[in-house]
Amino acid sequence: MTLLALGINHKTAPVALRERVTFSPETLDKALESLLAQPMVQGGVVLSTCNRTELYLSVEEQDNLQEALIRWLCNYHGLNEEDLRKSLYWHQDNDAVSHLMRVASGLDSLVLGEPQILGQVKKAFADSSRGHLNVSELERMFQKSFSVAKRVRTETDIGASAVSVAFAACTLARQIFESLSSVTVLLVGAGETIELVARHLREHHVRKMVIANRTRERAQALAEEVGAEVIALSDIDERLKEADIIISSTASPLPIIGKGMVERALKARRNQPMLLVDIAVPRDVEPEVGKLANAYLYSVDDLQNIIQHNLAQRKAAAVQAESIVEQETSEFMAWLRAQSASETIREYRSQSEQVREELTAKALAALEQGGDAQEIMQDLARKLTNRLIHAPTKSLQQAARDGDDERLHILRNSLGLE
């Protein structure tokens, strides 16, 4: 039995290829059934995200194994083999285990240390567990990767610092305001970055969120998800005074929030401070706003400085995380080797018990026929000894004839003679 990890990711393949190799949730079961129908595949898990598609497999070793699996993947997706080979990576046993642990821990992610990948790996495992896993070693490998990812999060600072604009904006807000549960946040825009910001804020139980967007329909879906109110951009002037935090990210060519607008809001707030985070390019907030007392304006460049500092911290933490992965990989491979030995031990024990049962049955039959008990017991002990040491004796003799001192030493050691 061999453990494999093969696939493509954001480092090896462009998005044009990655989107062609993806497995949708609707087709995953059929894909796994097709994969397990391959004679060499014993069990499998498919991990498919926007940044990677990977197969984790337990397989029987055979000639042309790599070619057979690449051919299956290409046939399933209608790909040219040469196009895929250029971007495909292939990890086996120790390297496959290490790769999965690194993936689950966020060490192989586009954003170093991002936590979302662990949830994606867990979902891939759960989806594949519906009748497609089949192999205890593969299951144990995934369970181990989950515990390693948790250990990396607990023992290192890899996830402690913001390394995305959205996360950095929320981190900044949490640093300035002691608790977000008492603040009102105005989000301007409804694009991807604002979506991420809104979800981060929801996780930190912000008191109230208001989303201002040019098109109400786009903002409405996000508002329903995070429990926010939707207003038009034209309403910002009137509603700005309610906001403790303003985070803006639109595609507007001109500023949406001007100095005069903020001055009026501050006056209505009796100069209670406002945090304005402008992550738009071009800028949504006039730079002059930053000169106002009690208006704290941060631009996307300010956030990038925070991100770069935090990324350096994550890279330092990643060194410690890699050591954890290396240690845990070694422990898992030791367990895997022990599992292989366990099967041999079971076979050897079963064989010995068959010999014992056979000779004991003969001895009991002899006793029933009135034979001398002492002679029968001595005969049983002699025959049992001879049968049990027959195979090791032959191996010792053969090693001696071959002049194989190393093998002779191993045999003597295994028999407890050294």
Swiss-Prot record:
UniProt-listed InterPro entries: 4pyrrol_synth_GluRdtase (IPR000343), 4pyrrol_synth_GluRdtase_dimer (IPR015896), 4pyrrol_synth_GluRdtase_N (IPR015895), GluRdtase_CS (IPR018214), GluRdtase_dimer_dom_sf (IPR036453), GluRdtase_N_sf (IPR036343), NAD(P)-bd_dom_sf (IPR036291), Shikm_DH/Glu-tRNA_Rdtase (IPR006151)
Q: Which residues bind NADP(+)?
A: G189, A190, G191, E192, T193, I194
Residues annotated as binding substrate = T49, C50, N51, R52, S109, E114, P115, Q116, Q120
What Pfam families does the record tag this protein with? GlutR_dimer, GlutR_N, Shikimate_DH
User: Which terms under GO biological process does the entry name?
Assistant: protoporphyrinogen IX biosynthetic process from glutamate
Annotated GO MF terms: glutamyl-tRNA reductase activity; NADP binding
Sorted keywords for this record are: NADP, Oxidoreductase, Porphyrin biosynthesis
Top-rank taxon of the source lineage equals Bacteria
Give any extra note attached to this record.
During catalysis, the active site Cys acts as a nucleophile attacking the alpha-carbonyl group of tRNA-bound glutamate with the formation of a thioester intermediate between enzyme and glutamate, and the concomitant release of tRNA(Glu). The thioester intermediate is finally reduced by direct hydride transfer from NADPH, to form the product GSA.
Subunit structure and binding partners: Homodimer.
Q: Which HAMAP family match?
A: Glu_tRNA_reductase
UniProt-recorded name of the protein: Glutamyl-tRNA reductase
The species this protein was found in? Klebsiella pneumoniae subsp. pneumoniae (strain ATCC 700721 / MGH 78578)
What's the gene? hemA
